[in-house]
Amino acid sequence: MPELPEVETVKRTLTELVIGKTIAGITVKWANIIKEPADVLEFETLLMNQTIRSIRRRGKFLLFEFDDIVMVSHLRMEGRYGLYEKEEPLPPHTHVIFHFTDGEELRYQDVRKFGTMHLFPKGSEEKVLPLAHLGVEPFSEQFTSELLMNAFQKTNRKIKVALLDQKTVVGLGNIYVDEALFRARIHPERLAHSLSKEEMAVLHKAIVSTLEEAVEMGGSSIKSYVNGQGEMGMFQQKLGVYGRKNEPCRQCGTDILKTVVGGRGTHFCPNCQL
């Protein structure tokens, strides 16, 4: 699933491609992707003649801001957007097509069909699901080690599970939680409330640095991820533990282990992470 670095990269690349384009029509080939409004015809009608003014990211969500409508899009497992000329053949698994007045098309592809799209009046999108109750952005001033300490001091959850909870800090998923914990030398099965003030400060720094570096490298292309221009990310080349089961730790040479924490496959170094 695309996490913060991948979604941020998609946002940046799409911004270069589609800002200022106006919707001339929409083709929906898989109606289940459209969640709000539930009626596909209403979805199409609301976006007709709307111009894309900006694209934002909130956690793992893309927010397409039109004249008076915001489309909240979640890529889920394998969703992707690409800009095409209308004459180009449709790629496999194309489920929603946004036809622009200049003849180009923004096409949404999704092998798994898990992605979602919601429309809301501009200004209301943060107050309702799926954005309501999301935690702080990890690149914001509000994200501090003190925030983590306060959020986790009364929980009995393991630190990996706690970090995956989008109500505390957004954008972290399986890849970057594993990587941040590795950098912080913290075992993923440690109870979150057991971390000391010093350990939490190290973890906070590891989260921010991991995400910053991943964004700089365009995210991680583990499976099918590409950005809005069809380019792969490069951060997978720097992964310390994720996807490296039985490979030597880059720090100590011990074989990386894989276990299950909170129902999620979890990679760690048994020597470096305590």
Swiss-Prot record:
Pfam families xrefs: Fapy_DNA_glyco (PF01149), H2TH (PF06831), zf-FPG_IleRS (PF06827)
UniProt keyword Transport, yes or no: no
Keywords: DNA damage, DNA repair, DNA-binding, Glycosidase, Hydrolase, Lyase, Metal-binding, Multifunctional enzyme, Zinc, Zinc-finger
Amino-acid positions noted as binding DNA in the UniProt annotation, renumbered to this chain: H93, R112
Residues of the active site: P2 (schiff-base intermediate with dna), E3 (proton donor), K60 (proton donor), R264 (proton donor)
CDD domains: EcFpg-like_N (cd08966)
Cofactor(s) recorded in Swiss-Prot or TrEMBL: Zn(2+)
An annotated GO BP: base-excision repair
Zinc finger (FPG-type): 240-274
Keyword Metal-binding in record: yes
InterPro entries, alphabetized: DNA_glyclase/AP_lyase_DNA-bd, DNA_glyclase_Znf_dom_DNA_BS, Formamido-pyr_DNA_Glyclase, FPG_cat, MutM-like_N-ter, Ribosomal_uS13-like_H2TH, Znf_DNA_glyclase/AP_lyase, Znf_FPG/IleRS
Gene Ontology terms for molecular function: 8-oxo-7,8-dihydroguanine DNA N-glycosylase activity; class I DNA-(apurinic or apyrimidinic site) endonuclease activity; damaged DNA binding; zinc ion binding
SUPFAM superfamilies per the UniProt record, alphabetical: Glucocorticoid receptor-like (DNA-binding domain) (SSF57716), N-terminal domain of MutM-like DNA repair proteins (SSF81624), S13-like H2TH domain (SSF46946)
Free-text remark on how the cofactor is bound: Binds 1 zinc ion per subunit.
Reactions this protein catalyses: Hydrolysis of DNA containing ring-opened 7-methylguanine residues, releasing 2,6-diamino-4-hydroxy-5-(N-methyl)formamidopyrimidine; 2'-deoxyribonucleotide-(2'-deoxyribose 5'-phosphate)-2'-deoxyribonucleotide-DNA = a 3'-end 2'-deoxyribonucleotide-(2,3-dehydro-2,3-deoxyribose 5'-phosphate)-DNA + a 5'-end 5'-phospho-2'-deoxyribonucleoside-DNA + H(+)
PROSITE patterns: FPG_CAT, ZF_FPG_1, ZF_FPG_2
E.C. designation(s): 3.2.2.23, 4.2.99.18
NCBIfam families assigned to the protein according to its UniProt record, in alphabetical order: fpg (TIGR00577), PRK01103.1 (NF002211)
Entry function: Involved in base excision repair of DNA damaged by oxidation or by mutagenic agents. Acts as a DNA glycosylase that recognizes and removes damaged bases. Has a preference for oxidized purines, such as 7,8-dihydro-8-oxoguanine (8-oxoG). Has AP (apurinic/apyrimidinic) lyase activity and introduces nicks in the DNA strand. Cleaves the DNA backbone by beta-delta elimination to generate a single-strand break at the site of the removed base with both 3'- and 5'-phosphates.
HAMAP family the record matches: Fapy_DNA_glycosyl
Entry's family note: Belongs to the FPG family.
Subunit structure: Monomer.
Protein name, as recorded: Formamidopyrimidine-DNA glycosylase
Species lineage: Bacteria, Bacillati, Bacillota, Bacilli, Bacillales
Encoding gene, per UniProt annotation: mutM
